[in-house]
Amino acid sequence: MEQKRNDSIDFAKGFLMIFVILGHIVQGTIEDGNLRGVIYSFHMPLFLFISGYMINLNKLIAQPVKDVFSKYWNRMLKAWLLAYVIFTSYLLLREPTIISVIGLTYSPWGHLWYVPTLFLYILLCKFLFGKTNLIVSYSVLILLGIAWNYVIQTTSINVSHWFDCSKLPYFALGLYFRNHLNSEKFNKPYIVAPLLYVPLYFAFVSLPFKTFGLGTALLLVGVIILYFYPALKNDTMPKSKVLSYIGKNSLYVYLWHQAPILLLVNYVSECNLTYYYIISFALLFLFILYIKLRKVA
């Protein structure tokens, strides 16, 4: 019997995808504490929580590495590679310098970090949970996230984003909620509390939006525990055909939404920021209207 699709996961991904787009449209730095900073404080952490929540560890561990590569090549890596080549080529054509070549080789541009990072998270979890016990596996994920954030916070090292472990705690949290929340040994409060709070604290205090501090971290984990996780598990999130459609196609929306924004930033915002916002939000409105008018929506 075919398992019913969880519409709440699609809704959540679509909802967060709108904020991903808004976060890239809004100009300014995250440190300014403006709307962009608020958006960045929750949209990618929750996206990574969902990504971890969608992983079935037993199936992942049982699959040969070759099959894992094949599965994710068709599911996301092939589409990502095309986007990476096109965006990188465009950026190098605009600035054909050796510094640009080195920079874009060392670390992918903008939003292109997510897919390779997610794939490496998955491979790491396959190895850890397949070779070690739960305590060791989760400890490694947490400590790796903490160590990565410590380096970012205390040194001037420009860490590559091909494998960005700074957000690993959120992925691990989703993984835990999906696969081990009902495990007796992990339901003990003195084990669960550090798993939930400590990694998120270290993640928040070292990221660009660290000014939101511990309060934001605890607020976000509270939202996850009290609403986000129960709503995903019980499929009780609001129904929206438009957001669900965006959620189902979130990979392609994520990979290509930056194309018009990048062109507008390069050719419009430098001349007239008002025109930039008018065109950007008009395009976003037309995108949503197009989905609304489609029969599949």
Question: For the regions a protein language model found, what residue spans apply to each?
Answer:
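Alpha-helical transmembrane segments
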Residues: 10-21, 78-86, 138-144, 192-198, ...
